Design a protein with these regions (language model features):
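Short Lys/Arg-enriched alpha/beta "domain-start" segment
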Residues: 4, 8-10, 14-22
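Ordered, soluble secondary-structure elements with a strong preference for glycine-centered loop motifs
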Residues: 21-22, 72, 76
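Divalent-cation
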Residues: 22-48, 66
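Short acidic-glycine loop/turn motifs at beta-strand connectors
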Residues: 56-61
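Conserved small/polar residues in nucleotide/adenosyl-binding loops
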Residues: 78-80
C-alpha cells in the first residue's frame, strides 16, 4: 500500500472516531496502532477540533495530514 493511502486511512479512522465522540487518547492510540501495524512510525496529535497525523517514509520524506473536526454533538451553552 502507498504511504499516502495509509496516511489517508489513518486520518479517516481518527476523524470518524472523533466525530463519533471518542476520547482524544483513544483516537491517538487507535491511529497510532493502525499505522504501526504497517511498519510505520507515525506521530499523531489530536485536540477536540483537529487531527494531525504525520510520518516519515523510509526515504526520509515527511508526509502530514491535518483534518478539521466540525462541531459534533457537544453541549451547546447557547441553548441553556
Amino acid at each position: 500500500m502507498e504511504y499516502d493511502d495509509l496516511l489517508n486511512m489513518g486520518t479517516e479512522l481518527g476523524y470518524q472516531l472523533m466525530f463519533s465522540g471518542a476520547e482524544i487518547y483513544r483516537v491517538e492510540e487507535s491511529v497510532y496502532r493502525l499505522l504501526t501495524a504497517y511498519g510505520l512510525q507515525p506521530q499523531v496529535f489530536a485536540i477536540p477540533n483537529c487531527l494531525i497525523v504525520s510520518l516519515n517514509t523510509p526515504q526520509g520524506h515527511p508526509i502530514t495530514r491535518m483534518r478539521r473536526i466540525p462541531s459534533h454533538g457537544t453541549l451547546s451553552l447557547i441553548h441553556i
